């Protein structure tokens, strides 16, 4: 089972869905389209392509720096790094993540440093060095824990780290990590970010071969998605259902989950569609 799931978490973090390019002519329009991503620290949203994010980061940076809107600036820079990863331009992503880290240090902005470390972790993950990626996430989490307004980023970074550890069978201390995530999520149970808790629990139960419990958490994910229909959530649901069906030896259903997912991935232009197709082929 683990071979079939080897790249799932990497793909979850790096693939974007983007189906429509909006013609945003002003920075205000661009920020408006990016608002759902900024507000909930989401990896992507329909209507904003990876190319748009990379371009808009360049266009918006001077104005955001002038206004000292570092909270938006560094999140946008992190999005641009992620977009480069999604397009397969890992070297550019690494350069931009390191530049982001240097900038945050220069202006002494801890949240920017934490977001840069998380972005660096994403580049390591895409370079198939998960252990180094985990180290970057741990550094980011340590900084975020000291920043009250970093709560949403802390949940995201922690859930990413948990998923990577699970994918690499690093089970030591994983329950402690999940319990910590639960304590964070319980502060705002109505927030869309609560989605990440059943997501991590579902994958943990799949890896632990506790499939009935895994299914319950998958169903919780679906209920949250019904209230907060963000495309990123749907992507995670499809991936984890595929892994659930593989673990349950329900290969027809696993293929169906992949088939429902692939059109979105191909439409996004992500280089990951080939990888997902290869994983699907292993199920045949």
Report each predicted region and the residues it spans:
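A "functional boundary" signal
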Residues: 21-284
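Positively charged n-region of N-terminal signal peptides that target proteins for export
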Residues: 1-7
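Bacterial N-terminal signal peptides
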Residues: 9-20
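Compositionally biased, intrinsically disordered low-complexity segments enriched
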Residues: 8-9, 219
């Amino acid at each position: 089972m683990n071979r079939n799931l080897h790249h799932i978490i990497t793909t979850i973090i790096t693939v974007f869905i983007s189906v429509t390019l909006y013609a945003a002519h002003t920075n205000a329009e661009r920020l408006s389209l990016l608002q759902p991503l900024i507000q909930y620290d989401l990896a992507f949203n329909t209507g904003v392509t990876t190319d748009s994010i990379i371009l808009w980061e360049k266009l918006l940076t001077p104005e955001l720096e002038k206004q000292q809107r570092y909270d938006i600036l560094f999140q946008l820079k992190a999005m641009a790094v992620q977009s480069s990863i999604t397009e397969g331009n890992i070297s550019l992503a690494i350069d931009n993540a390191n530049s982001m880290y240097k900038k945050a240090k220069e202006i002494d902005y801890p949240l920017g440093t934490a977001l840069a470390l998380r972005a660096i972790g994403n580049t390591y993950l895409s370079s198939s060095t998960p252990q180094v990626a985990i180290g970057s996430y741990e550094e980011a989490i340590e900084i975020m824990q000291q920043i009250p307004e970093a709560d949403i980023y802390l949940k995201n970074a922690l859930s990413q780290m948990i998923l990577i550890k699970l994918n690499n069978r690093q089970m030591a201390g994983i329950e402690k990590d999940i319990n910590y995530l639960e304590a964070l999520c319980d502060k705002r149970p109505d927030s869309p970010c609560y989605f990440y808790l059943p997501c991590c629990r579902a994958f943990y139960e799949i890896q632990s071969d506790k499939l009935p419990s895994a299914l319950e958490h998958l169903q919780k994910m679906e209920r949250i998605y019904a209230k907060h229909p963000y495309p990123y959530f749907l992507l995670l649901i499809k991936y984890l259902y595929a892994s659930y069906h593989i673990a349950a030896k329900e290969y027809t259903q696993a293929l169906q989950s992949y088939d429902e997912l692939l059109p979105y991935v191909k439409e996004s232009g992500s280089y990951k569609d080939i990888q997902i197709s290869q994983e699907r082929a292993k199920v045949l």
